[in-house]
Structures are given as C-alpha cells and as structure tokens.
Amino acid sequence: MEAKAQTPQQWRDSLNSINNDIRLFPNLTRLHLQKAAVLLQLLDWNEALEECNTVLLKDEGNLSALFYRAYANNQLHRCAMAKDDYEEILKQVPKHLEARIGLVFTLIWLNRLNDALDHANILVEMHPDNSEAYTTRAGVEMELKQYDTALYDWEKAIALAPQDNELLVQKAETLIALGRKQEAKATLDLAVKQGTPKGTLIPLYKQTK
C-alpha cells in the first residue's frame, strides 16, 4: 500500500483524529475507510479488517473496502480470502489495475502459477502502456523460470519507465539466469550510471564474471 511518508506517531495521531470523528458520525462510510487505510499503514491487519467489514455489511460492493480487506488478508496469509475479494472487485471493474496485480501475486502465493500468468496476460492486454503490467507478468515468468519471456517484459517495462533502476537490476538478474553475463554487466553498469550505488550490486556483479 503506497501512501505519503509519515512517521508511525503521525499515523497514530491521524487514527486518534478519525476515531474522534467516528464517535460523532458513526455511520459515515468515508470515515471507516479512512480508518482502515490508516490501520494498514500501522500494520494493524485485524483492526483494518474489522473496519472493512463494518463498511461491507452496509455496502457489500464497496471497492475500497474490498481492496483494503484483500490486502490485509494477504498480510495475514489468508490468501484464498484475499483472492475472493480481488475477484469481486474485478467483476465490478475488469480494468482495475491494482486489483488485477493483487490477484496475480495472490495466485503466486497460492502456487497457482498458470492462473497467475493468465491474469498477468490479461493485465498486459488491458494496460499495454503501463510498466507495472509488464513487471507483474515478468514476476510470474521468473517464478516459472520462463526467462526469455521475462526478459522481454523487463525490456518493455524499461522502455515505459527508463529511469526506474530497479527494472534494470531485474533485467540483469534475468540475463544472468540466461547465462548472458556480459549483457548483464552492461545493464548493471547502466543502473550505476543512473544512480544506483554500486556497492548494493556487488553480489550481482560477482555473478557476471
């Protein structure tokens, strides 16, 4: 879950403020969703689930509550439950990027790699100009040891997000897996040139020799 950088104390202060508002307006869905989002930032998965369930009891199709609940359930290793929520979101909004990505990784954790690849393919078809679609599919392909196709997807993602050095590192790892060590070293060199500290890449550099 991405959010603006705040300290844990700032998140707790936000939670206290939201709780005060909920005491005044206990039936406002927006407040319960805000509370769930803050609880996720505080890694309080069970409390976040309670807030999501409060919303879903009144509005069973609420997309934000389903998404937050899926995320929390994955953190609690309840991947089958997370899968159900992601699928419900996608029934309502088939092009929901984050839910499709969440479903792909949930299926990986459930060791349903072929299903994960199917959804990753759908993701790329629906979002051909989004680098995350290609990185998600590449992640599945790496799990399946389909390194050639993973390399293609890393390269597509890099073309869409050329300043993302993590993609270069992933590409280098894939080239190493393919035995293409010189190309891997050149890719690592580019990542260093673009700002990645070389010291963090020493283990990979060693594998290119």
Per-segment meaning from a language model:
Residues 41, 75-76, 109-110, 143-144, ...:
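Register position in tetratricopeptide repeats
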